C-alpha cells in the first residue's frame, strides 16, 4: 500500500517540541554544563547550533536535556549495542562419544576434537556408552574417563564426574579453564 500513513514509532527520548518541562538542566554539545534554563531558551540554543534538544533523564528535577544531533546519537547507540553483541559468546556444549573399547587411534582423534572445543571456549560433554557384555566391565569405562580427564587437565576443569552409571552410559562434563 503506497502513500499510506506512516506509523510514528515511539522514541526512547523526547526531543525538541515533545519536551514538557518548563525548566531544564542543560548540557552543551561537548557535555559541558550550561545550568538550569527555561525550555524556550534551551530550544533556541539548540536551534542556533543547528541540532536537537534531547531529554536525557526525564525523571530528574529539573529534567536533564542535552544539545546534540539526535540522528547521530541513535546511530552511535545502535553501533555500540552491536559491538556489545559481537563481544558476547554463547557457550555451547559439544558432545564426544566414547566406548570402553575405543582404540588408541580413535582416542587421539576424539581427544584432538575435545582440545579444539575447549580452546574455542565451549564446554565438552564426554559420553561413555556401554553395550551388551561391556556392562560387566564398568571399571574399564572409568579408566577411559580418568584418562581423558588427565590428558585435558591443563585445558579444562571437570564440572561433573560420574560416580555411578546412568542407564547404559556414563557422562562427564568439562569446562574450559579461565584464561589469565
Swiss-Prot record:
Compartment(s): Cytoplasm
Record-level GO BP terms: response to cold; ribosome disassembly
Alphabetized Pfam families for the sequence: IF3_C, IF3_N
Effect ascribed to mutating residue 107 to F/L: Reduced ribosome binding
Matching SUPFAM superfamilies: Translation initiation factor IF3, C-terminal domain, Translation initiation factor IF3, N-terminal domain
Residues recorded as bearing N-methylmethionine in the entry: 1
PTMs per UniProt: Phosphorylated on threonine residue(s).
GO molecular function annotation: ribosome binding; RNA binding; translation initiation factor activity
Gene Ontology CC, one term: cytosol
Keywords: Cleavage on pair of basic residues, Cytoplasm, Initiation factor, Methylation, Phosphoprotein, Protein biosynthesis, RNA-binding
Site (Important for 30S binding): 107, 110
Domain of life of the native organism: Bacteria
Entry function: One of the essential components for the initiation of protein synthesis. IF-3 binds to the 30S ribosomal subunit and shifts the equilibrium between 70S ribosomes and their 50S and 30S subunits in favor of the free subunits, thus enhancing the availability of 30S subunits on which protein synthesis initiation begins.
Any further remark recorded for this protein: A short form called IF-3S/IF-3 beta is found both in vivo and in vitro and is probably produced by degradation of the long form IF-3L/IF-3 alpha. The major form is the N-methylmethionine long form.
Entry's family note: Belongs to the IF-3 family.
Self-association and partners: Monomer. Component of the 30S ribosomal translation pre-initiation complex which assembles on the 30S ribosome in the order IF-2 and IF-3, IF-1 and N-formylmethionyl-tRNA(fMet); mRNA recruitment can occur at any time during PIC assembly.
Name recorded for this polypeptide: Translation initiation factor IF-3
Organism name: Escherichia coli (strain K12)
Amino acid at each position: 500500500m503506497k502513500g499510506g500513513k506512516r506509523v510514528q514509532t515511539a522514541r526512547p527520548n523526547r526531543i525538541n517540541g515533545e519536551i514538557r518541562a518548563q525548566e531544564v538542566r542543560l548540557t552543551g554539545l561537548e557535555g559541558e554544563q550550561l545550568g538550569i534554563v527555561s525550555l524556550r531558551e534551551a530550544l533556541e540554543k539548540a536551534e542556533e547550533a543547528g541540532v536537537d534538544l534531547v531529554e536525557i533523564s526525564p525523571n530528574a528535577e529539573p529534567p536533564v536535556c542535552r544539545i546534540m544531533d539526535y540522528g547521530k546519537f541513535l546511530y552511535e547507540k545502535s553501533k555500540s549495542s552491536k559491538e556489545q553483541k559481537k563481544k558476547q559468546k554463547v557457550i555451547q556444549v559439544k558432545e564426544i562419544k566414547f566406548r570402553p573399547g575405543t582404540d588408541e587411534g580413535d582416542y587421539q582423534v576424539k581427544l584432538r576434537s575435545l582440545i579444539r572445543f575447549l580452546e574455542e571456549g565451549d564446554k565438552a560433554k564426554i559420553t561413555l556408552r556401554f553395550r551388551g557384555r561391556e556392562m560387566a566391565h564398568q571399571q574399564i569405562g572409568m579408566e577411559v574417563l580418568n584418562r581423558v580427564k588427565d590428558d585435558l587437565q591443563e585445558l579444562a576443569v571437570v564440572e561433573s564426574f560420574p560416580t555411578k552409571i546412568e542407564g547404559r552410559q556414563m557422562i562427564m562434563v568439562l569446562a574450559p579453564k579461565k584464561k589469565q
